[in-house]
Every structure is written in structure tokens, then in C-alpha cells.
């Protein structure tokens, strides 16, 4: 209440002091509520996945309000706080991006509930941030530095998230210890299959829609899969299985390359005729 009263008193003063106070106000509150929720989760003996969800939930809520209900965050300054919208959103997404990347490397247990891919607290939180990020990239408040890279950033984040979901599925369903999951043969084979599916989808969709960038991304991912088969999976699969995997890869690339040829390059502007 004292904080609200202070903001109301600063409303009439205007200027940078009032905006800075309200800016800090909307950073303090998600921190306080998130820490309180984490403390409750610890004393309730909830697993780490729940604790992370409760820690980040207030930040996600504040970020969503900044995208869809800005007037709620702008009060009591109202229009005077509008110049801070882009900076506040950038701060929110910057902090959440660091937490998101860190959370990809956590086991993310959902106890006492069973772990289900995507439908678990940690990955639902990660997915929520991806959705908010997609919405942010379509707004005018997106920093100019990020605008040329928004498609690549979203694609890279989606790829990392799907890879993380795959590794977590191996960890829980194949009973592979999380610290050594990347060195496990089942995990590496699973990544090969998932990456191949993503590469084929990129190939096909890029060809059907005439999006050369998407088609090239699929082709690059399939090249990564080939390198992975040569350097990693062959040792895990053995000679016979390794040879079979190469044959299957070659047939897959041949069929997909025939059905989904490269889209034409973008037409270059015609040269002006010289007099």
C-alpha cells in the first residue's frame, strides 16, 4: 500500500523520476511474489519442476500483461509511462531468456505427479515463454537490433526446446541418469530420429511453400544428422546397425529430395535500362 501511495504521489510530478520508480516497481513485484511462491513450494516438498514454474510464473504474468494489458501496468502514470514499455519488455524477456536457457539443463521432476512430455510444470513454463516470445517479435516494441533475427531466434529456441524435451523423455522413460544423458546411446539415437523428422519437415514445408530459407534450414539439419551418424551414432549402433542407418538415411534423403526440390531463388530486381 505504501508503494502504491508513493506512485500516486509521484504521478503529478511527472518526469524521469516517476517513470524510473514505476519501472523498478514492476521489477520488484515479480521478484517478491516469485520468491514467496518458491518458499511455499519448498515447504510443501514439491519437486524442482514445480518450484521453477512457481518462481517464473509471476514474471510470465507480468510479461503477458505488458503485451496484452499494458494499461494495467501503466497505472497510475498512464500515458506518461508509455516510453518505458519497450525497455520493460526487453528487461522481462532478457531475464526470462537467461532462466529459460538455464532450465533446459535441469531434470525438472514433476513429483508427486508422473512426468509426461510437455505436460509437466517445467516444460509448460518453457513453452509459455516461447509463445510470449513469438508474440513479442510481432510487436512494434521489439528492439531494432533483434528485428532482422527474429525468425532465426525463434527457430533456434524451438529447436533447443524440442531437443530438451527429447532428452528429458529418455531420462524418465529409459531410466537414464540425467548427468550422463548425452553420452547414452538411446539418447543419441532419439536425437537422430527427432532431428531427422525436423529436417524432413523443413525440407518439405520449405519446398511446398516456396520458402528457400526454411528449405535450406532443413537441408543443413540433415547434414548435421549425417555428421552425427558418422561421428557419434555409428559407435553406439555397431557395424551392421550403423551401415543400415546410413542406407536408411540415403534413401530418405533421395526420396525427400525428389519430392521436395529446392524452391527457386528470389527474383533479383531487373537492371534499369541505360539510355
Predicted regions and their residues:
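Alpha-helical transmembrane segments of multi-pass membrane proteins
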Residues: 1-275
Amino acid at each position: 500500500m505504501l508503494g502504491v501511495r508513493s506512485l500516486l504521489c509521484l504521478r503529478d510530478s511527472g518526469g524521469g523520476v516517476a517513470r524510473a520508480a514505476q519501472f523498478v516497481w514492476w521489477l520488484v513485484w515479480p521478484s517478491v511474489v516469485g520468491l514467496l511462491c518458491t518458499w511455499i513450494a519448498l515447504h510443501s516438498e514439491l519437486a524442482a519442476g514445480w518450484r521453477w514454474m512457481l518462481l517464473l510464473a509471476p514474471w510470465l504474468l507480468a510479461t503477458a500483461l505488458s503485451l496484452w494489458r499494458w494499461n494495467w501496468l501503466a497505472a497510475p502514470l498512464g500515458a506518461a509511462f508509455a516510453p518505458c514499455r519497450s525497455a520493460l519488455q526487453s528487461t522481462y524477456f532478457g531475464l526470462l531468456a537467461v532462466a529459460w536457457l538455464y532450465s533446459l539443463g535441469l531434470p525438472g521432476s514433476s513429483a508427486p505427479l508422473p512426468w509426461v512430455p510437455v505436460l509437466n510444470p517445467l516444460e509448460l513454463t518453457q513453452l509459455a515463454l516461447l509463445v510470449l516470445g513469438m508474440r513479442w517479435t510481432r510487436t512494434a516494441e521489439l528492439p531494432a537490433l533483434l528485428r532482422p533475427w527474429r525468425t532465426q531466434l525463434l527457430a533456434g529456441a524451438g529447436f533447443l526446446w524440442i531437443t530438451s524435451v527429447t532428452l528429458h523423455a529418455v531420462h524418465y522413460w529409459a531410466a537414464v541418469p540425467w548427468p550422463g544423458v548425452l553420452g547414452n546411446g538411446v539418447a543419441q539415437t532419439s536425437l537422430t530420429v527427432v532431428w531427422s523428422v525436423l529436417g524432413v519437415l523443413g525440407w518439405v514445408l520449405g519446398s511446398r511453400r516456396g520458402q528457400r530459407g526454411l528449405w535450406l534450414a532443413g537441408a543443413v539439419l540433415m547434414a548435421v544428422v549425417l555428421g552425427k551418424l558418422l561421428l557419434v551414432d555409428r559407435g553406439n549402433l555397431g557395424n551392421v546397425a550403423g551401415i543400415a542407418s546410413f542406407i536408411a538415411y540415403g534413401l530418405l534423403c533421395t526420396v525427400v529430395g525428389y519430392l521436395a526440390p529446392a524452391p527457386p531463388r528470389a527474383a533479383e530486381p531487373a537492371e534499369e535500362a541505360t539510355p
